[in-house]
Amino acid sequence: RSLVSLVGTDSHTEKLGLYSGFNLVEYAAALEIPEGKLRFVDQWAYHNSIPNDAMAAIYTASDVLLAATMGEGFGLTVLEAAACETPAIVSDFTCQPELVTDDSYIVGGQPFWNSAQNAFWQVPNVGEIVDALEAAYARGRFRSAAQRRLALGYDADRVFAEHWRPALVRLTEHAREHAPSGRTKPTPTPADGPLLTI
C-alpha cells in the first residue's frame, strides 16, 4: 500500500499539469515522496483512452477511489468505480454525495470563486481526505454491493428511457404547441420512434 497509483481522466491529473491542475512531478518532489513510490499513468495511453476492461481491472483492484475534487460536475469515474463495487472518497460538493452510498466517504472543503468559470468551486479538506484514506485502509479489502446497485440506476439506456425520452417528448409537444405561426410544427412521434420529426 506504499505505492500510490494515479489514474485520471482530466487535466487535474496530468503529470505536468494543465489548466487549473498542477505539476504532479514537482508536487511529489516538494512532498519528498521517494522515487519509485509514485507511479503515473502512461501519458500517451491516458490521452488516447485506457480500454474499458483495463479500467474495470484498475477499479476492481483498488480498495477505494479517491475522487475528492474542486468542481467535478457529475463524476462519471465515481460511477465507473461503483459499477466495480469499489467505494469512493468524494467531495461534499456538486452532485458527488449523490453518487456514493453510506460505505463510501464524503469530505468537506473550502469554497472559492473560480472567475474563469464564473462559479464557486471547493478545495477539498486534505485532513479529511487523509482520515478517509486511513479509514479505508483500516477497513481492508472491501467490495460494495450497495455502490454497484446505485451505479446500475445510472445505466445509460435506463436513464434515457426513464428520464430523457419523456423530457424530450414533452419538449417536442411544447414546441408543437408554441411554434410561431407560419412555421412548420414538429410532428409528435410514437414513444419508441424517433424523438422529433419535422
Residue map of PLM features:
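Short hydrophobic beta-strand element within catalytic cores of glycosyltransferases
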Residues: 78, 87-90, 104-106
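Aromatic "clamp/platform" in nucleotide-sugar-dependent glycosyltransferases that forms part
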Residues: 70
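Nucleotide-activated donor-binding/catalytic signature segment of Leloir-type glycosyltransferases, i.e.
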Residues: 18-57
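A short alpha->beta transition loop at the rim of the catalytic pocket in nucleotide-sugar-dependent
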Residues: 63, 85, 92
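A charged, aromatic-enriched C-terminal amphipathic alpha-helix characteristic of glycosyltransferases
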Residues: 124, 128, 138-167
